[in-house]
Amino acid sequence: MLATDSTPALLAASVVLAVSLVSYVIQLNRSRTHRAFWASHPWVGVRDEWFSGARTKLRIVTSVREMVEDGFHRFSQFKTAFALPNIGEPPWLVLPPASLREFLAKPDADLDHNIIHEEQLQNYYTQGALGHHAATIPLQFDVVRRQLTRELPLVAAALHDELHKSFQDYWGTDTIAAKQIDLLATCFKIVTRTANRVFIGADICRSEAFLEHLRRYSDAVGRAGIIIRLFPRWLRPVVTPAVTVWYRRDLAVCREICVPVIRCRVQQTIEKRKDVDCTWKAPVDVLQWLIEAALRRNDAAELDPLLLTQRLLMLNFVSIETTSMAITHAIADLYGSADADSFIAGLQEECERALPHGELWTKAQLDNLVRIDSAIRESMRVSDFSHIQLPRLVANPHGVDFQSTGNPPLHVPPGIRLCVPAHSIHRDPALYPDPLTYNAFRFVIEPSVGAGDATEPAPKQASLATTTDSFLVFGHGRHACPGRFFAAHLMKLMLAYIVRHYDVARLTQPVDKQTTECTKAPFHMEYGGGPLAYMGHSLTGATRLQDTLCFMKFDSSQYLDTSPIVTIPSYIYWPSLNTMNQSSKYSLYVFVVLVACVAALFIGIGIYQMYHPLDRDNAAYREVPHEQRAYMRKAGSPPAFSKFIYRLYCPNIQWKVKRCIGVLFLLFAYYNSRLRLSSATKN
């Protein structure tokens, strides 16, 4: 039985759930200002059915890819923009490819990209004041753009050295027996460890505790941003403590590991600047460049070890997961293709020709691997995990015009969110013949017959890190991904190492019954066009790696004095790359039902107690000021709505509201535990 003093909390929770989950999330977010604008554009995914708007927004969680494809074929190819519904947020206006150049030519004063990213990531709430400062003054991204890209030749040897040690630890070097691995999990560890060799140094990057807590932190921050976006702005400060509690321990461990090293590095750098005779030699890594950039700003706050740690964590958050997913897809696409044998033979021939034996590979040598480059670029085209790209917000108070959409030109008012259908562009038959087929050498021209001794194919298009109007994985234009050159170098290094030292054979049958019935939940919630998505990365619409297992043997000929044994049978199995696994579906259904039941319970109790007369024994009545008690005892008590408002804002309500909102996140914890349980069951 519910206690009397819980009345205000129950009423407050009913309002919170009703407003947040019904009015804000389910209803179409069309302001009065933009209602006429949205009515003048075609919509995708809308059907002639009851509650069409709400059902369309719910449907985008699982069908965003189909909606974008439908809009591309029906409208984009005829130079017409279309509206893509969104759940919990305003809809997207998807521009046709014909407007891409004009779209990218607009100045930042007209189309802002920072506001969109801040809204999607919710840095202020998910990463606190330090994270917000790091996003506002992005020294870490400036360092990557200006110094890491330029100094790649200097760090290439360290990358290869760490990559070799990582493969030894996670894939093994057994030349006799094959080893079973989880491809996605091990690729994430290898990428994280190798990248952090350049980010922060060898000591920290080899700490298993740091790698594990960094993975959990990155995973939880992404999910927290998705959840916080579901709530109205005025409610986000209230729900943030409950959402961020899941990864506070992970953040604390990462800080505990990094802060002493960073503090020591800062002191050594300052002493080196003061004493030219100091024998300490500054390492060549991102941390050192960050410290030097902070010193150039003449701001002592920038040298705070906690802030520098947050910058490194943010750099990991935005780079590691996408790179890990991309290289995992590349391996799966390559070894799972119908022509895998011929592709791998060509890649092995190129690696044998271009890469020396028993030496650390340089950047110049990797730049010659045009087939490796093409194989990864093709995988990123076929298995992209973003349905829409280049998000922008119209910031010009007078709006912007697009002449390329026809006559009359398209006028977009301020506040509208724009994007382009990247996934559909990557699969456009007009740009890529046979676009659904993985062709590892699509971007390479093989030497023609009679052309002489041309043993190395010439690249057909630009390198992996180069963006074009038809290749938007890294974005395009002046705001393209600043770390794409480093990511491309790392992925080429990984794939070349695998091709050089391991053979992969695809098994035709699942490993066991458990593998066929269970699917591994992904290590992060994909962002996207809805509440469970970010910039077009939907929870179920994007290509998903589910069970990717490898069996391998190490080719010891490169490092050991034994004969080469190159047989790494690898099994790559995915029941359905484009559908959610059954465990995740079941957990999501249970979570939605529980939330609906709690909302109905709170609203029902609130309505009942709203009409229940107050009396002197009621705890809520005793909290009423004396001057108001007479009014409540008068004949003809106040209307029910007035009682409702009073009970909502009675004293000491704030902490009770937080307590009741916590119930909702306990349900989310159950949903999250189901995802982890489905992963642990299989492992």
Swiss-Prot record:
InterPro entries: Cyt_P450 (IPR001128), Cyt_P450_CS (IPR017972), Cyt_P450_E_grp-IV (IPR002403), Cyt_P450_sf (IPR036396). Its cofactor is heme. The chain crosses the membrane at residues 8-28, 588-608. One of its GO terms (molecular function) is heme binding. It is an enzyme of class 1 (oxidoreductase). GO terms for biological process: secondary metabolic process. The keyword Transmembrane applies. Due to their effectiveness as antifungal agents, echinocandin derivatives can be used for the treatment of human invasive candidiasis. It is a multi-pass membrane protein. Its EC number is 1.-.-.-. CDD domains: CYP503A1-like (cd11041). One of its GO terms (cellular component) is membrane. The keyword Iron applies. Keywords: Glycoprotein, Heme, Iron, Membrane, Metal-binding, Monooxygenase, Oxidoreductase, Transmembrane, Transmembrane helix. This is Cytochrome P450 monooxygenase htyF. The lineage of its organism: Eukaryota, Fungi, Dikarya, Ascomycota, Pezizomycotina. The gene is htyF.
